[in-house]
């Protein structure tokens, strides 16, 4: 074997354009953190579901890529997007169709084996699958119509609202939560009936925020895995028996997205699509609503928030200035925020790595402020 040939080929690669090294570091880091939490906190069982979901997710994703190619489920890149994204056209999409069900199956199996199965898990499973199906319809229309536009915004919001209302009715009828919102320390604010419309807004906002974040290779899957891990650790630290099943749900979701990340990092071999991103956001919101971790989710999900707010600012300022002075003004080069940095000339992998690092910092902050 000509080792010199392979060594020279490796040296010639631009590692800044390959997200594998940092993805492996992220996976190892989350595994190490899970080991530490399991060692120092009684009843913590994060490592087994994490490792299991990473391995199974990676295997299923590799198999799924082949299946998605066979049925021609490939990404369509919008013409008005960054020019560097045209090379992503044709990449298999709808990867979330494998990851979400697998993570839910594993979560419920772990819950049954540990005698922690609960109605909360049923509600979360319903919410995740329902939002996955909405994303699936959206992705399928986009793929079959050969354009980066599936369901209309109105149709998507209506479907998300219907599912959100069903979820909220379910948790209300089963008395699975209260209307208090925990903020700093043990301070709470009771919202009473106002909690329910706010909860519905959070479901829609979070699912669409993760959807907006899914615009760079490995960005949403990495950030999502970090936030799920943070929520799992916070729930374990609380020491409430009712939260252990949800903590298992969170760490299994984290593992599933980490397994997916192996193939979703730059250069991506598969995208999660709306099928995955909507389910991810809905799951995060559902966990926060059921476990009173809304404040923590707001802090941990700072990147999701920033991406969403950047779009609101961009559209709002553009429409307002166009109405007042006849010419629309853009605050950012392009929204969501990650596209702004792309057009500034920052490499995709650098943007993703920095957004991951910011998420890690804010996850640590949220846990310390609990």
UniProtKB/Swiss-Prot annotation:
Names of required cofactors: Mg(2+)
Name used for this protein in its record: Phospho-N-acetylmuramoyl-pentapeptide-transferase
Gene Ontology BP terms: cell division; cell wall organization; peptidoglycan biosynthetic process; regulation of cell shape
Family membership: Belongs to the glycosyltransferase 4 family. MraY subfamily.
Function: Catalyzes the initial step of the lipid cycle reactions in the biosynthesis of the cell wall peptidoglycan: transfers peptidoglycan precursor phospho-MurNAc-pentapeptide from UDP-MurNAc-pentapeptide onto the lipid carrier undecaprenyl phosphate, yielding undecaprenyl-pyrophosphoryl-MurNAc-pentapeptide, known as lipid I.
Top EC class of this enzyme: transferase
Membrane topology: Multi-pass membrane protein
Keywords, in A-Z order: Cell cycle, Cell division, Cell inner membrane, Cell membrane, Cell shape, Cell wall biogenesis/degradation, Magnesium, Membrane, Metal-binding, Peptidoglycan synthesis, Transferase, Transmembrane, Transmembrane helix
Organism: Prochlorococcus marinus (strain SARG / CCMP1375 / SS120)
Subcellular location: Cell inner membrane
Keyword Transmembrane helix listed: yes
Gene (name only): mraY
């Amino acid at each position: 074997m000509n080792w010199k040939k392979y060594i020279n080929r490796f040296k010639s690669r631009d590692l800044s354009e390959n997200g594998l090294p940092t993805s492996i570091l992220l996976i190892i880091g989350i595994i190490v953190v899970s080991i530490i939490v399991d060692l120092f906190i009684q009843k913590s069982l994060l490592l087994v579901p994490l490792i299991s979901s990473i391995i199974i997710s990676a295997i299923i994703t590799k198999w799924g890529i082949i299946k998605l190619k066979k049925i021609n489920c490939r990404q369509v890149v919008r013409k008005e997007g960054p020019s560097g994204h045209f090379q992503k056209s044709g990449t298999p999409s709808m990867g979330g169709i494998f990851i979400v069900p697998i993570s839910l199956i594993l979560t419920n199996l772990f819950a049954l084996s540990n005698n922690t199965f609960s109605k909360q898990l049923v509600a979360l499973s319903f919410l995740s699958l329902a939002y996955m199906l909405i994303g699936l319809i959206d992705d399928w229309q986009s793929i079959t119509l050969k354009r980066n536009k599936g369901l209309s915004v109105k149709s998507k919001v209506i479907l998300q609202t219907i599912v959100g209302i069903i979820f909220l009715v379910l948790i209300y009828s089963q008395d699975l939560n209260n209307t208090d919102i925990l903020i700093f320390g043990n301070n709470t604010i009771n919202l009473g009936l106002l909690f329910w419309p706010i909860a519905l807004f959070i479901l829609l906002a979070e699912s669409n925020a993760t959807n907006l974040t899914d615009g760079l290779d490995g960005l949403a899957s990495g950030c999502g895995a970090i936030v799920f891990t943070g929520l799992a650790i916070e729930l374990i630290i609380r020491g409430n028996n009712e939260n252990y099943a949800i903590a298992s749900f969170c760490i299994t979701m984290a593992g599933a997205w980490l397994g997916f990340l192996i193939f979703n990092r730059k250069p991506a071999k598969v995208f999660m699509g709306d099928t995955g991103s909507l389910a991810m956001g809905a799951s995060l919101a559902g966990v926060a609503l059921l476990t009173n971790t809304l404040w923590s989710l707001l802090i941990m999900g700072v990147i999701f928030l920033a991406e969403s707010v950047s779009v609101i600012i961009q559209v709002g300022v553009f429409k307002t200035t166009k109405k007042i002075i006849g010419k629309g003004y853009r605050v950012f080069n392009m929204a969501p925020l990650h596209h702004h940095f792309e057009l500034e000339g920052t490499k995709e992998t650098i943007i993703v790595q920095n957004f991951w690092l910011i998420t890690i910092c804010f996850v640590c902050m949220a846990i310390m402020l609990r």
